[in-house]
Regions:
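Short edge beta-strands and adjacent beta->alpha junctions
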Residues: 1-135
Length: 135
Protein backbone atom coordinates (compact mmCIF):
# COMPACT_ATOMS: atom_id res chain seq x y z
CA UNK A 1 0.00 0.00 0.00
CA UNK A 2 1.62 3.26 -1.00
CA UNK A 3 1.56 5.96 1.68
CA UNK A 4 2.82 9.52 1.98
CA UNK A 5 6.50 9.14 2.93
CA UNK A 6 7.03 9.33 6.67
CA UNK A 7 10.14 9.25 8.84
CA UNK A 8 10.35 6.11 10.98
CA UNK A 9 13.61 7.13 12.66
CA UNK A 10 16.66 9.37 12.34
CA UNK A 11 19.62 8.70 14.65
CA UNK A 12 21.28 12.10 14.12
CA UNK A 13 21.18 13.96 17.46
CA UNK A 14 20.28 17.32 15.88
CA UNK A 15 17.24 15.90 14.09
CA UNK A 16 16.41 12.78 16.08
CA UNK A 17 13.13 11.08 15.26
CA UNK A 18 12.25 7.94 17.16
CA UNK A 19 13.74 6.55 20.33
CA UNK A 20 17.40 6.83 19.34
CA UNK A 21 19.63 9.89 18.89
CA UNK A 22 23.07 8.28 18.58
CA UNK A 23 24.84 6.59 15.65
CA UNK A 24 25.00 2.83 15.28
CA UNK A 25 28.30 1.44 16.55
CA UNK A 26 30.59 -1.08 14.87
CA UNK A 27 29.13 -4.58 15.03
CA UNK A 28 25.86 -3.29 16.49
CA UNK A 29 22.44 -4.74 15.76
CA UNK A 30 19.62 -2.25 16.40
CA UNK A 31 15.98 -3.33 16.75
CA UNK A 32 13.28 -0.91 15.56
CA UNK A 33 9.52 -1.20 16.04
CA UNK A 34 7.74 -0.43 12.74
CA UNK A 35 4.04 -1.05 13.30
CA UNK A 36 2.08 1.43 15.36
CA UNK A 37 2.28 5.22 15.45
CA UNK A 38 5.47 7.12 16.25
CA UNK A 39 4.01 10.57 15.58
CA UNK A 40 5.35 10.61 12.02
CA UNK A 41 4.39 7.17 10.73
CA UNK A 42 1.29 5.14 11.37
CA UNK A 43 1.78 1.60 10.12
CA UNK A 44 -1.10 -0.81 10.80
CA UNK A 45 -0.52 -4.01 12.79
CA UNK A 46 -1.68 -5.99 9.72
CA UNK A 47 1.41 -4.87 7.77
CA UNK A 48 3.66 -7.81 6.85
CA UNK A 49 6.51 -5.82 5.26
CA UNK A 50 7.51 -2.24 4.48
CA UNK A 51 9.09 -0.37 1.59
CA UNK A 52 11.66 2.07 2.97
CA UNK A 53 14.26 4.54 1.84
CA UNK A 54 17.23 3.93 4.15
CA UNK A 55 20.01 6.54 4.18
CA UNK A 56 23.39 6.36 5.89
CA UNK A 57 24.90 9.65 7.08
CA UNK A 58 28.34 10.54 8.52
CA UNK A 59 30.01 7.11 8.26
CA UNK A 60 33.33 6.98 10.12
CA UNK A 61 34.66 3.90 8.30
CA UNK A 62 34.06 1.63 5.33
CA UNK A 63 31.18 -0.67 6.20
CA UNK A 64 27.80 -2.07 5.26
CA UNK A 65 24.26 -2.12 6.65
CA UNK A 66 21.90 -5.09 6.64
CA UNK A 67 18.15 -4.67 7.28
CA UNK A 68 16.10 -7.78 8.09
CA UNK A 69 13.08 -9.10 10.05
CA UNK A 70 13.69 -9.03 13.81
CA UNK A 71 12.68 -12.68 14.22
CA UNK A 72 15.00 -13.99 11.49
CA UNK A 73 18.71 -14.75 11.49
CA UNK A 74 20.93 -12.06 10.03
CA UNK A 75 21.36 -12.69 6.29
CA UNK A 76 24.75 -12.57 4.57
CA UNK A 77 23.55 -9.95 2.05
CA UNK A 78 23.80 -6.21 2.70
CA UNK A 79 21.43 -3.39 1.75
CA UNK A 80 23.92 -0.50 1.71
CA UNK A 81 27.69 -0.42 1.28
CA UNK A 82 29.94 2.63 1.73
CA UNK A 83 33.44 3.94 2.35
CA UNK A 84 34.43 6.08 5.32
CA UNK A 85 33.42 9.76 5.21
CA UNK A 86 31.22 9.13 2.15
CA UNK A 87 28.38 11.58 1.46
CA UNK A 88 24.90 10.60 2.60
CA UNK A 89 23.83 7.53 0.61
CA UNK A 90 20.24 6.27 0.25
CA UNK A 91 18.89 2.93 -0.95
CA UNK A 92 15.39 1.48 -1.26
CA UNK A 93 14.84 -1.49 1.02
CA UNK A 94 11.83 -3.81 1.14
CA UNK A 95 11.88 -5.79 4.37
CA UNK A 96 9.52 -8.30 5.93
CA UNK A 97 8.40 -7.48 9.47
CA UNK A 98 8.70 -9.87 12.40
CA UNK A 99 5.56 -11.27 14.02
CA UNK A 100 5.82 -8.35 16.48
CA UNK A 101 6.19 -5.72 13.72
CA UNK A 102 9.93 -5.14 14.15
CA UNK A 103 13.07 -5.02 12.01
CA UNK A 104 16.77 -5.21 12.81
CA UNK A 105 19.60 -3.16 11.33
CA UNK A 106 23.19 -4.42 11.52
CA UNK A 107 26.15 -2.05 11.06
CA UNK A 108 29.38 -3.91 10.35
CA UNK A 109 32.07 -1.31 11.10
CA UNK A 110 32.70 2.21 12.37
CA UNK A 111 29.87 4.46 13.47
CA UNK A 112 27.07 5.65 11.21
CA UNK A 113 23.83 7.58 11.51
CA UNK A 114 20.81 6.03 9.82
CA UNK A 115 17.63 7.65 8.53
CA UNK A 116 14.65 5.48 7.53
CA UNK A 117 11.61 6.78 5.66
CA UNK A 118 8.68 4.47 4.96
CA UNK A 119 7.05 4.89 1.54
CA UNK A 120 4.64 1.96 1.69
CA UNK A 121 3.71 -1.28 3.36
CA UNK A 122 2.53 -4.75 2.37
CA UNK A 123 -0.41 -6.61 3.91
CA UNK A 124 -1.96 -10.01 3.29
CA UNK A 125 -4.68 -9.83 0.69
CA UNK A 126 -7.96 -11.50 1.54
CA UNK A 127 -9.79 -12.44 -1.63
CA UNK A 128 -12.53 -14.75 -2.76
CA UNK A 129 -12.22 -17.78 -5.04
CA UNK A 130 -12.72 -15.73 -8.22
CA UNK A 131 -9.00 -14.98 -8.10
CA UNK A 132 -7.80 -18.41 -7.05
CA UNK A 133 -5.75 -20.31 -9.62
CA UNK A 134 -5.69 -24.07 -9.21
CA UNK A 135 -2.51 -25.91 -10.08
Amino acid sequence: MPIAPCRLFDTRSASAVGARSTPLSAGETYTQKVTGDNGNCSIPPAATAVAMNVTIVNPSATSFLTVYPADAPQPTASNLNWVGNQAATPNKVDVKLSATGEIKLFNNGGTVDVVADIVGYYADHNHDDRYYTKA
